[in-house]
């Protein structure tokens, strides 16, 4: 089509082109199947932008991915769903983030929120501080890569000197990552948690942003970050400073 090759399925496309990454924009009803098609094709990485995939669909595809890996099959990393993607400035962008706000540098950014990722990156760039890689994890309750996974990658990355880790209410991921950082992280981390004023039981934007217990609150997560040696800000306008 207009000089662009079209293939019947992901496996055929990967075989013909050598592609190793799939980015999924498929509507929610078919997105989990699209993720699994990429996993079956043994791609290295799947990035799912789609928001609103049924939880049951994501549970099923996650179960199949784990079963495949347990049986000795190739492991495929999943970023998302409901994420903006990933960017290494001046090298590669896979997703929907505005590329012009990024500047190549040595600060990593990881966040559950796409817009807060953009805000942190824009602040850094305005201050003349570049980014090594910015990763949007996505805000759905069932997802792939988590904060702890990306923090481990940044810790091992020779091109990253410091990290901004942004989270939000709901779930244990940020606290687990902070505790891992206390034991293993060799680089300074700035932390921010959105949702300080969020009432319990009310979803705030993302499907996964829901306080279901005391440890899920922004205050509790910020306290854990401080205990683990993070430089914490309570104001999103100060994430880059």
Predicted regions and their residues:
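Catalytic-core regions of core metabolic enzymes
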Residues: 1-241
């Amino acid at each position: 089509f207009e000089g662009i090759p079209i293939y019947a399925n992901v496996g055929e496309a990967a075989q013909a082109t050598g592609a190793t990454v799939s980015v999924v924009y498929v509507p929610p009803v078919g997105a989990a199947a699209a993720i699994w098609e990429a996993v079956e094709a043994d791609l290295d990485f799947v990035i799912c932008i789609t928001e609103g995939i049924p939880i049951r669909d994501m549970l099923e595809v996650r179960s199949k991915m784990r079963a495949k890996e347990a049986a000795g099959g190739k492991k495929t990393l999943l970023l998302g769903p409901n994420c903006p993607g990933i960017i290494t400035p001046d090298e590669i962008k896979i997703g929907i983030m505005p590329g012009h706000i990024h500047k190549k540098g040595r600060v990593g950014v990881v966040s559950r929120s796409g817009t807060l990722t953009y805000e942190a990156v824009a602040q850094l760039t305005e201050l003349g501080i570049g980014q090594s890689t910015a990763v949007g994890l996505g805000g759905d309750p069932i997802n792939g890569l988590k904060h702890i996974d990306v923090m481990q990658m940044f810790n091992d990355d020779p091109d990253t000197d410091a990290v901004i880790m942004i989270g939000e209410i709901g779930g244990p991921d940020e606290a687990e990552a902070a505790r891992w950082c206390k034991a293993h992280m060799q680089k300074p981390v700035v932390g921010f948690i959105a949702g300080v004023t969020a009432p319990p039981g009310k979803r705030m934007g993302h499907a996964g942003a829901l306080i279901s217990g005391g440890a899920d609150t922004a205050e509790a997560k910020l306290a854990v970050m401080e205990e683990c040696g993070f430089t914490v800000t309570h104001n999103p306008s100060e994430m880059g400073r």
